[in-house]
């Protein structure tokens, strides 16, 4: 970084230190946004693949009831 960034009193051809720090901040921000979008996309594809797999599998078990109806009185009995 010292080859590219110099202080304001340096010779011409180098970038000012404040500009260099700003560019590093912008590069880190862009890299972070890229990582965020990339991870979100991978997670979306993984969830979609997992959902299709779960919907595509046939269950041999007949007792796959998730919700079971109950009488209204049973909820209030203690």
UniProtKB/Swiss-Prot annotation:
Q: Where in the cell is it found?
A: Virion membrane
One GO cellular component term of this record is:
virion membrane
Q: Which residues cross the membrane?
A: 19-39
Sugar-modified residues? 9
Chief place where the protein resides: virion
Xref: InterPro entries? Herpesvirus_UL41A
UniProt keyword Membrane present: yes
Keyword entries, A-Z: Glycoprotein, Membrane, Transmembrane, Transmembrane helix, Virion
Q: How does it sit in the membrane?
A: Single-pass membrane protein
The similarity comment for this entry is: Belongs to the HHV-5 UL41A protein family.
Give the protein name, as stated in the record: Protein UL41A
């Amino acid at each position: 970084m010292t080859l590219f960034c110099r202080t304001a009193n340096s010779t011409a051809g180098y970038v000012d230190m404040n500009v260099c720090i700003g560019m590093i901040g912008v590069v880190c921000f862009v890299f972070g946004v890229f990582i965020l979008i990339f991870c979100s996309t991978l997670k979306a594809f993984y969830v979609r693949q997992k959902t299709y797999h779960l919907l595509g599998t046939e269950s041999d078990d007949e007792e796959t009831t998730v919700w079971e109806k109950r009488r209204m009185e049973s909820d209030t009995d203690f």
